[in-house]
């Protein structure tokens, strides 16, 4: 009897994908760790880049699921999103934080600091630590340089409002690994899902 590897269905809703990514392991060129924080965005969500329809900047969000959508936030930091829902829909999941596990020396060098809790605790920090830039946008995340392994066992997940946005701030589409010290920001009165 063979054991099948758990998988994440990227054609599902962004909320379901965001929740199922918590506890998954993400490596980029062999560097990375466990995903501990995500946020979901959908085409009918005023906080989503896809809300006003396809543009040159967000066209990857409207492509096939299971691809990387990279954009620059505030003209400074790269941010990594995973496209979900069927092509043409315009949905994604922002990777907000990971627990660094593999390639810590490389991450420390890229980030210029040693505190493991700060290496990947925020979307810009994730991209800097993992060496992710615009050139990765549109790449499939189920082939190198990406390696995504779903969690083998269920993990405790908390949810709450998304952060760092000006619209739809109360929508509880931020997900985190309960008790993780590697979150970008603690959850205020989190709900356990």
Curated annotation (Swiss-Prot):
E.C. numbers: 3.2.2.-
One annotated GO biological process: base-excision repair
Protein family according to the UniProt entry: Belongs to the DNA glycosylase MPG family.
Upper taxonomic lineage: Bacteria, Pseudomonadati, Pseudomonadota, Betaproteobacteria, Nitrosomonadales
Native organism: Nitrosospira multiformis (strain ATCC 25196 / NCIMB 11849 / C 71)
Keywords: DNA damage, DNA repair, Hydrolase
Domain of life: Bacteria
GO molecular function per UniProt: alkylbase DNA N-glycosylase activity; DNA binding
Matching Pfam families: Pur_DNA_glyco (PF02245)
Official protein name in the record: Putative 3-methyladenine DNA glycosylase
């Amino acid at each position: 009897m063979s054991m099948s590897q758990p998988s994440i269905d990227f054609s599902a809703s962004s909320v379901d994908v965001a929740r199922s990514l918590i506890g998954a392991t993400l490596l980029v060129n062999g560097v990375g760790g466990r995903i501990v924080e995500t946020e979901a965005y959908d085409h009918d969500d005023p906080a989503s880049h896809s809300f006003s329809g396809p543009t040159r900047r967000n066209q990857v969000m409207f492509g096939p699921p299971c691809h990387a959508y990279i954009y620059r936030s505030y003209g400074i930091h790269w941010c990594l999103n995973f496209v979900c829902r069927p092509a043409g829909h315009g949905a994604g999941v922002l990777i907000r934080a990971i627990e660094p596990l593999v390639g810590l020396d490389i991450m420390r060098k890229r980030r210029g600091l040693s505190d493991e809790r700060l290496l990947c605790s925020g979307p810009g920090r994730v991209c800097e630590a993992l060496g992710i830039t615009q050139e990765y946008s549109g790449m499939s995340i189920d082939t190198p340089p990406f390696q995504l392994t779903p969690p083998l066992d269920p993990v405790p997940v908390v949810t709450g409002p998304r952060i760092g946005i000006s619209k739809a701030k109360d929508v509880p589409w931020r997900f985190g690994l309960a008790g993780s010290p590697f979150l970008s920001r603690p959850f205020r009165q989190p709900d356990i899902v």
